[in-house]
Regions:
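C-terminal edge-of-domain segments
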Residues: 127-141
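Compositionally biased, non-globular sequence tracts
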Residues: 19, 139, 143-144
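Residue-level signal for inorganic ion chemistry
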Residues: 42, 73, 136
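Glycine/charge-rich, flexible interdomain linkers and switch-proximal surface loops
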Residues: 55-70, 118-130
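Short, conserved loop-to-beta-strand elements that form functional interface hotspots
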Residues: 100-129
């Protein structure tokens, strides 16, 4: 599962760890049942999404076209199940070893297709700042 936002900066222990001037903040959450095919498909989908505004004000440009970059953050809380009770459950999240593998694979895939990419630290507590244009936020998963 991947959640896209447009402005991005991330700090760990009050030190700037990553930022990007133009592009996407991508929150990544691996779910049970995800595999390399899901990671590869999401990488390709993100590279082809026409979500940046053209001169006509329409979402028509890709991340590559605008010369954008990605800041990728692991975010297992996207797997939260809040259907019952008031405390979220995370039983649908992939185990940490698989999640870290898929997170690193996703980042490697972005770099392989020439998207400049910075990343957070898997499992770390981070302060993430964003300024969201639009606002425009997109949810992508294996069904996208």
């Amino acid at each position: 599962h991947t959640w896209l936002r447009r402005q991005r900066q991330m700090c760990i222990r009050d030190r700037l760890k990553g930022s990007c001037a133009k592009g996407l903040l991508i929150f990544v959450c691996a779910m049970k049942g995800d595999d390399e095919n899901v990671v590869n498909a999401l990488t390709q989908k993100i590279s082809k999404l026409r979500i940046f505004e053209s001169s006509e004000g329409k979402m028509d440009l890709t991340l590559h076209y605008i010369g954008g970059e990605a800041l990728v953050i692991s975010q297992f809380t996207l797997a939260a199940d809040i259907k019952k009770g008031n405390r979220p459950g995370f039983s649908s999240a992939a185990n940490p070893q698989d999640a870290n593998y898929f997170y690193e694979l996703f980042i490697a895939n972005l770099k392989r297709i020439k998207i400049p990419t910075q990343q957070g630290v898997f499992g770390a507590s981070m302060k993430v700042e964003l300024l969201n244009n639009g606002p425009a936020t997109f949810w992508l998963d294996s069904n996208s």
